[in-house]
């Protein structure tokens, strides 16, 4: 655990970029409301800096960053900008209402990126960096500068440009391993050398931002801290471009559990890590792999008889941390068809949900209906039910009823009733199998050009009456949208998941139309 005598020099600032770098993961787009929910949770759990988005990219991103800034309580709210004047100004405008705002500007510094991507000389990159940091500092006190592809940059050049941007006013200097190329020992030496050679390095906080292309993002991040960095940039569940980013939960628990090797501390409330993982997974429709460290379903599961015997005698035989440390509670048979509202509300509060009266009533009704169809109600069932209810609250297309005729002979036929913007529509369709019939029915009811990229099914809990959780990814106009849904009936879950992804496409098209109209 964290040392008793805490000092600022040993504090590691946790910079979460789930809402920016994490959302750049293909198919992980979040709605405006989902971004606000994730940001509130990150703030509550003690994240120091929340990178809320990339304001210049769209009106939607600007509005999300601005609203998160307005609602912020304790965290610094950062926005990303390229090294362009318009980016800097737009970013500063987006975070200006935060209690503490930050402009985070980035430019490439490796020979390859400067030559191929930027088409700039090293001296031009220094000149641009200094000018943009100074421009940002004229508008805000907290400015972070990032050297994209930093670990493939030349050390002598990096020392010169870092010294220059600190002199221009950068308060944080971030050296990313943008393509996940470095290894721990190398990164420790790299950061240590850089900090020692930059004359004014004591005037800024040094930061690391590691990608997971070789599976070493967390190890490299910790190595960077050993080398002198005091800010770690990471995401919930490690989501991010390509192979992802360093996982926040793994960074934090590695420091806490192995404080003998990493004598540092942070402000994260670790009991909220599991909840944060589930909220982000629901918002992005990206399931967490079962064997994911810290927050995976099997992270604290023991099936081997030898392991079970050891854990029953003393949990420390096979557990290096207690499940309670990360907010994990074992599945329990608490709710059923005889449960009342009071017990249901208490269970939701215990699991960290805050629902409004209408959402609560809808969730309670669905729980009772599920209890009539399913013998045992587990925590995972409640989470799947409520997460789906919250995600569907803004949907324009809703499933009212579904009947499927399937068997060994004859075509498979689906009959579906949808509520489309308050109008009830009914249609029938055949298909090559029941799922195909269901999806063909949706296409008849809501004509669209989206292509099915992914269809996955897995059980939420065990048993023949377990809920099926279906993931569907649709692509449209070069964008991918993913949604998940759960139901004891796999076909119903399939229809809901498909409609969830379709609703995201409709919402995106609507937002783009509004943005275009506002710009004209």
UniProtKB/Swiss-Prot annotation:
Ligand binding (Mn(2+)): 21, 209, 211, 245
Annotated EC: 2.3.3.13
Domain of life: Bacteria
Pathways per UniProt: Amino-acid biosynthesis; L-leucine biosynthesis; L-leucine from 3-methyl-2-oxobutanoate: step 1/4
Domain Pyruvate carboxyltransferase residue range list: 12-274
Full protein name: 2-isopropylmalate synthase
Subcellular location: Cytoplasm
Renumbered residue ranges of the record's region Regulatory domain: 398-520
């Amino acid at each position: 655990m964290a040392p008793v005598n805490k000092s600022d020099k040993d504090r590691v600032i946790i910079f979460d970029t789930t809402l920016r770098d994490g959302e750049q993961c293909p198919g992980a787009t979040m709605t405006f409301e989902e971004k606000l929910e994730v940001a509130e949770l990150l703030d509550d759990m003690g994240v120091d800096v929340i990178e809320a988005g990339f304001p210049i990219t769209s009106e939607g991103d600007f509005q999300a960053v601005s609203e998160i800034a307005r609602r912020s309580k304790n965290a610094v709210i950062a926005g990303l900008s390229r090294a362009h004047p318009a980016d800097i100004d737009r970013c500063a405008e987006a975070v200006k209402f935060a209690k503490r705002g930050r402009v985070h500007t980035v430019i490439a510094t490796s020979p390859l990126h400067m030559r191929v991507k930027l088409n700039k000389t090293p001296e031009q990159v220094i000149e641009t960096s200094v000018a943009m940091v100074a421009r940002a500092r004229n508008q805000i006190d907290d400015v972070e500068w990032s050297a994209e592809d930093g670990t493939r940059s030349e050390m002598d050049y990096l020392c010169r440009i870092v010294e220059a941007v600190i002199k221009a006013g950068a308060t944080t200097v971030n050296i990313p391993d943008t393509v996940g190329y470095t290894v721990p020992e190398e990164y420790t030496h790299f950061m240590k050398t850089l900090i020692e050679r930059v004359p004014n390095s004591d005037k800024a906080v040094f930061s690391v931002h590691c990608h997971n292309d070789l599976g070493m993002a967390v190890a490299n991040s910790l190595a960077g801290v050993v080398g002198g960095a005091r800010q770690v940039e990471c995401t919930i569940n490690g989501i991010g471009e390509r192979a992802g980013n360093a996982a926040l939960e793994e960074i934090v628990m590695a420091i806490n559990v192995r404080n003998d090797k990493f004598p540092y501390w942070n402000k994260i409330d670790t009991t909220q890590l599991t909840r944060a993982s589930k909220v982000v997974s629901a918002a992005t429709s990206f399931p967490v792999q079962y064997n994911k460290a810290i927050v995976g379903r099997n992270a604290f599961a023991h099936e081997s008889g030898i392991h079970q015997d050891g854990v029953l005698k003393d949990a420390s035989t096979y557990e290096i941390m207690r499940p309670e440390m990360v907010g994990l509670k074992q599945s329990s048979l608490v709710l059923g068809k005889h449960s009342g509202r009071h017990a249901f509300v208490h269970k939701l509060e215990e699991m960290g949900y805050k629902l409004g009266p209408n959402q609560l009533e809808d969730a309670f009704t669905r729980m009772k209906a599920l209890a009539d169809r399913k013998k045992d109600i587990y925590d995972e069932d409640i989470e799947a039910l409520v997460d789906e209810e919250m995600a569907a609250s803004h949907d324009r297309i809703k499933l009212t009823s579904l009947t499927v005729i399937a068997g060994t002979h004859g075509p498979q036929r689906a009959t579906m009733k949808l509520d489309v913007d308050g109008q009830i529509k009914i249609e029938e369709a055949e298909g090559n199998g029941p799922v195909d019939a269901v999806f063909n029915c949706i296409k008849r009811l809501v004509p669209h050009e989206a292509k099915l990229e992914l269809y996955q099914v897995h059980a939420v809990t065990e048993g023949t009456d377990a809920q099926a959780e279906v993931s569907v990814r649709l692509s449209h106009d070069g964008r991918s949208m993913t949604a998940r849904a759960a139901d004891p009936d796999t076909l119903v879950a399939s229809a809901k998941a498909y409609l969830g992804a379709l609703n995201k496409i409709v919402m995106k098209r609507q937002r783009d139309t509004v943005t275009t109209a506002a710009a004209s």
